[in-house]
Amino acid sequence: MSSKKAFLLPIVIEMNDDGYLASVPGLQGAFAEGDSVEEAVFNCVDVVKMIAAYRAERGESLGFDAVDFNQNTRMTVALPVGIID
């Protein structure tokens, strides 16, 4: 299996009138809404992937450090999980 790149990005999550807004500070256009915290984060990750692909086509960097991700890599991340009251 070949090595892949992973970006560790800060994602800010806020409540808004329609649900939740997730955004990546420092990455223009990287924001998305969702009805839940998880959906907003998932949608924002999709937007980041589109921005990364566009910038790669133009030979531009995403502006964040990439981590080589392979069979020997382990990464611990914190993900928000919405709790229903």
Which stretches of residues belong to each language-model region?
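Short, charged, surface-exposed hinge/linker loops at domain edges
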Residues: 1-9, 42-85
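Residue-level detector of intrinsically disordered, flexible termini
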Residues: 21, 29-31, 77
